[in-house]
């Protein structure tokens, strides 16, 4: 599921990539379309489940194995997801502002989704995908960007 999601992110980023100069650097919040995207691909699970040795609940929110023994409602699942998305938003916004990276709402949503699903390790400037963002994705071929993102798709 995470590989499919990451492939979707690759497509989203590639379709939306425009020269950075076309946009002002600003802070964003995830759009309702971005939230719906996460919910659709994560799917709701009322009880904790294991995936790759980690435990999750609701819409893919990280938890501990013993958390939520009685499960959670969809409303609670969405609240938990939005709390985690807010953390991801702050981290992505910090990256963008620190390096003066201008993006579209669509690109921001994709990066928040990537941080939510795969973690934030990809935000390290020494890693290819982050270094491409910093120096301008437009300087690289689509194949190079896809390969840089694909590295992280195999992490989750």
Question: What is the predicted function of each stretch?
Answer:
Residues 38, 57, 111-114:
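Residue-level detector of buried hydrophobic side-chain packing
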Residues 8-17:
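Bacterial N-terminal signal peptides
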Residues 87-126:
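Active-site nucleophile-His-acid catalytic modules used for acyl/amide transfer and hydrolysis
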């Amino acid at each position: 599921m995470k590989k499919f999601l990451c492939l979707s992110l690759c497509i989203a980023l590639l379709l939306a990539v425009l020269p950075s100069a076309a946009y002002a650097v600003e802070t964003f919040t995830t759009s309702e379309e971005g939230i719906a995207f996460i919910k659709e691909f994560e799917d709701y699970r009322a009880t904790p489940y294991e995936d790759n040795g980690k435990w999750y609940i609701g819409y893919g929110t990280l938890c501990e194995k013993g958390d939520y023994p009685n499960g959670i409602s969809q409303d609670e699942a969405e609240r938990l997801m939005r709390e985690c998305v807010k953390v991801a938003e702050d981290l992505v916004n910090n990256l963008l502002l620190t390096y003066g990276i201008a993006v579209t709402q669509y690109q921001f949503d994709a990066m928040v989704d990537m941080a939510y699903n795969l973690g934030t390790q990809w935000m390290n400037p020494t890693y290819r995908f982050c270094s491409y963002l910093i120096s301008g994705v437009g300087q690289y071929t689509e194949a190079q960007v896809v390969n840089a993102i694909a590295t992280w798709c195999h992490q989750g």
